[in-house]
Each structure stands twice: as structure tokens, then as C-alpha cells.
């Protein structure tokens, strides 16, 4: 069950689809509906995805979701309960290629973010970010289903040595945990 590969495949599909190219959707605002409809079809690709978002760097105050085009501050505050918009935007803008992070104000969410190069110019940074919003509870249930370990016994979730979730809310390294029958220590993909 390689959820990371599924998310990567979606990012690759978006990157090559003409709907998402700035030259295309800027021709007519109705073309923005094609972006929204296309994003909606990807939501069901993975059981982990709660929301799928597209954020263009050239339009830093807006994003596209699987439901609509929305103001970034309004979406973050109303849907994800994130009020520190600039902090979130800075987290995004620090990403090159791919990263997973937990927003400071939303420890119950994991954001898988792919930087997309949509203009075809390969020697520059990306034009947009594709974000998958994954609730920690949904990821824990997924891990429980695969591993058989009850989600309440999962102390922390790591991906490639990066802490994505900790029950205590504090940062720990894997070496600080004692391996026992209540904890899964594993490496690899989601």
C-alpha cells in the first residue's frame, strides 16, 4: 500500500495537464472551473486525502480546492482552523520538490505538498504547489488497518526521519522511543 506513490502520480498528472497551465486558465475565467472539476476527481484516489488544494505562487491570496476557488486566508481559517496565514504561506514557499509538514496551528493535520513546474521552464523554481490535506486520525486508522496496531498505541508517525505526528505534541527522535509491543517502528512509504 504505497500512498506516497499515489500522491506523486496525482502531482505528475496535474503537472502535465493543460488545464493547470497559467497560459490556459488565464484565457477565460470559465477555465478555472476545469481546474476545480479536475481536482475533484483526484480526491478519491487515496483514502488518506481529505482535501486537495492548488496554490499558484503568482496568486498568493487564492487557492483552488476540489470544491471552488477561494481566498487563502478564508479557506485556512474556515476549513483548516489556521489563522496564521503568513506562517503557512512561508512553510509552503520553503518547499522545493516535495515535503510533508504539520501546520503549527493544526497538529491534527498533515500537509503533503508538491512543488509543480507548470510553465515548462525547467531551470527555475515551481509555479504552484499541490497540497494534500491528510487528517492524522485518518492516517492512524490507515496504519492500524495495515499493521494491526491500534491507533491509540501509535506514539509518533515519521516519514523519512521527519516527525509528522506525536501523541505528546513534542518533537522526539526515534531513538528516544523504546521498542515494545505497543509501538510500530517502521521506515518506508505511507
Q: How would you describe each model-predicted region?
A:
Residues 7, 50-54, 153-157:
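Short, hydrophobic-rich beta-strand element in sensory/regulatory alpha-beta domains
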Residues 29-39, 68-104, 139, 148-152, ...:
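Extracytoplasmic/periplasmic sensor domains and loops in membrane signaling proteins
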Residues 34-46, 118-165:
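Solvent-exposed, extracytoplasmic
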Residues 5, 9-10, 25-26, 33-39:
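Intrinsically disordered, low-complexity terminal regulatory regions
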